[in-house]
């Protein structure tokens, strides 16, 4: 499976796929990485898949805080390009913090990967499904 890399990078981790858009501002605790609405689990270390991000430009600041605090996802895969989240990732890299890959993969392709599936992402946007059954921590 191949995604479009917006900000290239390599990552691996369990997929957390949400079927609804997410606002990082008010939707994610920047200190812990916890989602504030169901499924109320942590996004830290996951390959977070979303159909879209919603919200204001403050979402880039929340993602920047997640990266600074070590509570960010390992990679972010969206159904459409989102410049606001990309800005947060770019700012983290400029500040010397770990930046994460940002990719675009359409909803039909996202639906082929279940939450808990371990994936590996290469720098070209290739997504290799490694195994099923990872437990996402609540």
What are these language model-derived features?
Residues 124-138:
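Phosphate/diphosphate-binding glycine-rich loops and adjacent basic-rich segments that engage nucleotide
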